[in-house]
Amino acid sequence: MIGDLLKGFNASFGDLLTSTEAGQGTIKDNMDDLCDILEDEILKSKASEDEKKALLKKLRTFCNTETNIMLVGATGCGKSSTINALFAVSEECKDIEEEEYLEEDQPQKTYVEIAKVGSKADPETKDIEKYRIGNLILWDTPGLGDGTEIDEHHKEVITELLRKEDEEGKALIDLVLVILDGSTKDLGTSYKILNDVIIPELKNDTSRILVALNQADIAMKTGRHWDYEKNEPDEILIQFLEEKVQSIKNRIKEDSDLDISPVYYCAGYMEESGDVVHPYNLSKLLYYIMQSLPAQKRVAIMEGINTDSDHYEYNDEEENYNEEIKDSFYDSFDYISDGVDTGVEVGGTILGIPGAIIGGFLGGFVGCIKSILDSIF
């Protein structure tokens, strides 16, 4: 299968091929080229016309599918810092009207717009901010907990967005990332939106809900217990965080009878003293996001990630999350051939025949993608 081949591919050999048409570029640049080449390989293959149609349909779905993630949380929980830590949302992002960037001749760049969700929106209340990074779309909902009336408005726009459908009549939002403030005991507002809106609207589908506890570094009020040199919690803080995560899980179970396991992390920031707290467990959070999404939805995530390798350096040691992230991405390629019953060779890869991929432009682009990912993770 393609995923296994990508994992075993010799990236350094692929780099030798980049002197032709395959440049270093970005993950998205190389993915676009790789998709074009795979399409050409399918068309040139000895597969039947029906098999070609099936493969092409899945390939185009895989390469062009948008992924929509909604972020929900109380004011001050760190939604914006999480977005900036995880994804390539730069200060150069500009406001742009939706119809402008949907024109075919407009390049797929990173844009931010104010999404007018909710016809009864009060001009004094905040609207949902919508970030587009290629095929990745992030919906940053307004912070909760600033007053009953304002929260009711926010609940309405969140509900409306959760009910939106895509062109195929499927739910628009693929994943709801609920961010909790690890520095406070008062999580009532977040529990309320989770139990009153998110869980009911998603019809108890826990695969589309991810709960994350941010600001893990300041979770304890009695001393920081944060090792600045190692950029990690000490044993006392780890135990506290594990107990807090278990408490949150128990509370959600008690309220909804659903099993949702939160992940704790720190999005990173600079203190007034100049001390830098780098992101911690960001790779773990990204891995959980990848695993929560269907295979064909993961490409957009990788195309939109923040490529600063420092963000993924510090994690707990429960798993090698960086390798798991890459494997999850490579495994997603198997979506193209899953369910297509054919025995012919397509690009030397799609049906598990690894011969042709180590030659020609295809190998170069695969090598580029692997090299880029290896430099990040």
Name what the model sees in each region.
Residues 2-141, 146:
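Conserved G1/Walker A P-loop phosphate-binding module
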Residues 156-258:
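Conserved C-terminal guanine-recognition region of P-loop GTPase G domains, centered on the G4
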Residues 29, 362-377:
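Membrane-engaging insertion elements
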Residues 73-75, 139-144, 178-181, 211-224, ...:
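Short loop/turn segments at strand-loop or loop-helix junctions that form parts
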Residues 97-101, 105-112, 154-155, 225-236:
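Short, flexible helix-coil linker/hinge segments at the edges of structured domains or between repeats
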Residues 210, 219-354, 358-361, 365:
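C-terminal end of P-loop GTPase domains and the immediately downstream helical coupling element
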Residues 143-152, 233-234:
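Flexible beta-alpha connector loops of hexameric P-loop NTPases
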